[in-house]
A protein has these predicted regions:
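Alpha-helical substrate-recognition element adjacent to the catalytic core
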Residues: 1-79
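C-terminal cap/substrate-recognition subdomain and adjoining C-terminal extension
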Residues: 54-117
Length: 117
């Protein structure tokens, strides 16, 4: 059985964009339901990552009470932007599926872009 790793982004994906602390995080319930459903599959591993760093991903997992569903958290290692303005990330892992709000992302082998904006 092939294991599938699915990475969920924090800002603009699991929570609405604009939070500056754990106290103003507004959950995106639709995406959280998706995470919960995918976590129920035997061969799926859920990870959460953020361009804001591993600590921000850890905070989101705690505040959203999804720690029991998440195997690990990571930083997406934001390095800056390229000449077109697109974000440059150098994450430590390449998941099978990356679920994100950034349209110009190529973070996973398959990239699903949420429609939250």
């Amino acid at each position: 059985m092939k294991k599938i790793t699915i990475a969920f982004d924090v800002d603009g994906t699991l929570i609405q964009t604009g939070a500056t602390s754990e106290w103003d995080m507004i959950p995106n319930r639709r995406i959280l339901r998706l995470l919960e459903a995918l976590a129920s599959f035997k061969n799926v591993t859920i990870v959460v990552w953020s361009g804001g760093g591993k600590e921000w991903a850890d905070t989101a997992v705690k505040m959203l009470d999804i720690g029991h569903l998440v195997k690990a958290t990571y930083s997406k290692n934001l390095k800056g932007r390229d000449e077109s303005g697109a974000y440059i990330f150098e994450p430590d892992i390449k998941p099978d599926i990356a679920i994100d709000d950034i349209h110009a992302c190529n973070l996973g082998f398959l990239n699903l872009i949420v429609n939250e904006k």
